[in-house]
A protein has these predicted regions:
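N-terminal alpha/beta PP-like core and its mobile active-site loop of ThDP/TPP-dependent enzymes
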Residues: 15-70, 119
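Single conserved hydrophobic/aromatic residue that forms the stacking wall/gate
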Residues: 1-8, 12-13
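Redox- and metal-dependent alpha/beta enzyme cores, enriched for Fe-S-associated oxidoreductases
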Residues: 165-201, 205, 211-217
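Peripheral docking tails and interdomain loops at the edges
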Residues: 230-280
Length: 280
């Protein structure tokens, strides 16, 4: 079991083939990507341009990875425990998709008590050659087994059924529901409070797992007339997942920034404009 921390472009340069091999070998790992801005060399400024790379595998072959999205320095810390637990539970890589705003932020953190962890509880873990111990082998050619496709499909189905995580904030009665993760979700929550003070019913769904995407969260949005993602990227990389989550029954818009964080006032204005455009 391993952990590795990277930023932005390092993820595709150094890591993608390795993640594909980890999946093939059915091995747990935790990889951290502190997302930053831009393609190519990029910049250390705030950004959320790695969403597609995080949620669509990114390497070769048929695989997905569990992706957690912290929204605070506290969650940066707490989600490491969650990530390792999930990695071991499913024998699968888990990505922690933080962003440069949180990565460069100073906040107080409460460190939780350590929990005893039995490192010998798994029969697949390599612990060195002990006298009388049966050999333990790691291989990455399980896919030659005729049962492998069903094994992998059932693993992903179990993850989708059991590991969707999200935070809902005033989404149940909202006319427009914002969808945002990471630092964008914190700014969006401020926008919701601002809009509510004006009498405009704005809500927020914050995906905590980017995969499995929390489609169950959208079932509670009974009053919604439109959805709008708030992201720090150019192309609105999360829009397609929201469209799938709402089964294309509602308009899904996008408000994004590139250099600089989104402003709550502009988020509210964009949400109002979207509602007016849809004539609702």
């Amino acid at each position: 079991e391993i952990s590795l921390g990277l930023v932005g472009s390092e993820m595709c340069i150094r890591d993608r083939e390795g993640i594909s091999y980890l999946v093939a070998a059915d091995l747990p790992a935790v990889i951290i990507d502190v997302m930053r801005i831009g393609t190519g060399l990029g910049d250390i400024a705030q950004g959320q341009g790695d969403y597609w790379q995080m949620t669509r595998g990114g390497g070769h072959g048929d695989y997905r990875t569990i992706v957690l999205a912290p929204a605070s320095v506290q969650e940066n810390c707490d989600m490491m425990t969650t990530a390792f637990d999930l990695a071991e539970k499913y024998r699968h890589p888990v990505l922690v998709a933080s962003d440069a705003a949180i990565g460069q932020m100073v906040e107080g953190v409460e460190l939780k008590d350590f929990v005893d962890h039995d490192i010998d509880q798994y029969d697949w873990a390599i612990r060195g050659c002990k006298a009388g111990q049966a050999p333990r082998k790691v291989q990455n050619v399980y896919y030659t087994n005729p049962q492998y496709p069903e094994f992998l499909r059932s693993k992903y189905q179990a993850i989708e059924d059991n590991e969707q995580r999200w935070e809902s904030y005033h989404a149940e009665d909202a006319d427009v529901v914002l969808v945002a993760y990471g630092i964008s979700s914190r700014i969006s929550k401020e926008a919701v409070n601002m809009a509510r003070a004006e009498g405009f019913k704005l809500g927020l769904i914050r995906p905590i797992t980017l995969w499995p995407y929390p489609v169950k969260a959208f079932e509670t949005c009974k009053n919604a007339k439109a959805f709008m993602t708030v992201e720090i990227n150019i192309l609105g990389q999360m829009v397609d997942d929201v469209k799938l989550a709402v089964e294309n029954k509602y308009p899904v818009g996008f408000y994004g920034t590139f250099f600089g964080l989104p402003e709550p006032e502009e988020i509210v204005a964009q949400a109002k404009a979207m509602l007016e455009k849809e004539g609702k």
